[in-house]
């Protein structure tokens, strides 16, 4: 079983994706578990006029040295990670089974091999999701995190990247995928696929399924698929 500990300001953004299909089943069958830690829960409350008497849990501030936007403060994130580590250590005495990931577009490239290794080596993966202009860099220094990127692009926050990691790593956990899904998982790339109807008519033009796929000749079909991988 793999436990994902997600440090995020927006835990509700995960609900729909984790509550459906393979990941929902994996959680129900206790193949994986996902727990959230909101840095706001570890921040000291202040009051701002815009919210009258409601406490405002601040987790960001202006960057030192100037620049646009706001930066997530270190202490609320540190405390959230500490809580995640405490929960992880209750379940495993081997610290080598715990991994802390700091999501960053400049980090190590996440891929299928990374997902496989993570599923094999770790029982607890703590994923830190940034927002705004980023997180105070001292968080990385304190915990000696591993910077990981899901691609050479910038996202509004780390939540989407975290979902990608959860999905990909979970698929490598034994028992999460069925036979059909396992077949899909072995493909680095996939050929074109077709289903009924055999002839699709769109704007008076006919689009037909390749004849080889209708032939019943499994060897020919396999050769066709190998030649049409994209």
Where do the PLM segments sit?
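Conserved RecA-like P-loop NTPase ATPase core
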Residues: 67, 130, 217
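N-terminal nucleotide/polyanion-binding subdomain common to many enzyme families
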Residues: 1-85, 221
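SAM-dependent methyltransferases
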Residues: 1, 195-230
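S-adenosyl-L-methionine/SAH cofactor-binding core of RNA-modifying enzymes
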Residues: 71-129, 136
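Short His-Asn-centered micro-motif
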Residues: 10, 103-105, 128-131, 151, ...
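Hydrophobic/aromatic beta-strand patches that form the interior of the parallel beta-sheet core
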Residues: 5-7, 35-37, 101, 125-126, ...
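Internal, active-site/partner-interface "lid" segment
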Residues: 160, 172-211
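Structured adenosyl-cofactor binding patch, chiefly the S-adenosyl-L-methionine
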Residues: 135, 139-182
């Amino acid at each position: 079983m793999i436990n994902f500990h997600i440090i995020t300001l927006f835990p509700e953004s995960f609900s729909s994706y984790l509550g459906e299909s393979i990941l929902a089943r994996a959680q129900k069958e206790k193949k994986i578990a996902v727990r959230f830690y909101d840095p706001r829960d570890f921040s000291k409350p202040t009051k701002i006029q815009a919210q009258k008497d409601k406490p405002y849990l601040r987790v960001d501030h202006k960057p030192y040295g100037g620049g646009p936007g706001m930066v997530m403060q270190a202490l609320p994130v540190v405390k959230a990670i500490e809580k995640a580590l405490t929960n992880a250590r209750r379940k495993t005495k081997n610290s080598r089974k715990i991994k802390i990931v700091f999501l960053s577009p400049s980090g190590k490239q996440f891929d299928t091999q990374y997902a496989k290794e993570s599923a094999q080596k770790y029982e607890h993966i703590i994923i830190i999701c940034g927002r705004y202009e980023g997180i105070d860099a001292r968080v990385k220094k304190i915990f000696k995190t591993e910077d990981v990127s899901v691609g050479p692009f910038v996202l509004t926050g780390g939540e989407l990247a975290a979902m990608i990691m959860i999905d990909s790593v979970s698929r490598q956990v034994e028992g999460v995928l069925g036979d059909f899904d396992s077949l899909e998982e072995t493909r680095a790339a996939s050929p074109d696929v077709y289903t009924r109807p055999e002839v699709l008519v769109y704007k008076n033009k006919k689009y037909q399924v390749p004849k080889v796929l209708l032939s019943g000749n499994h060897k020919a079909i396999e050769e066709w698929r190998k030649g049409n991988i994209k």
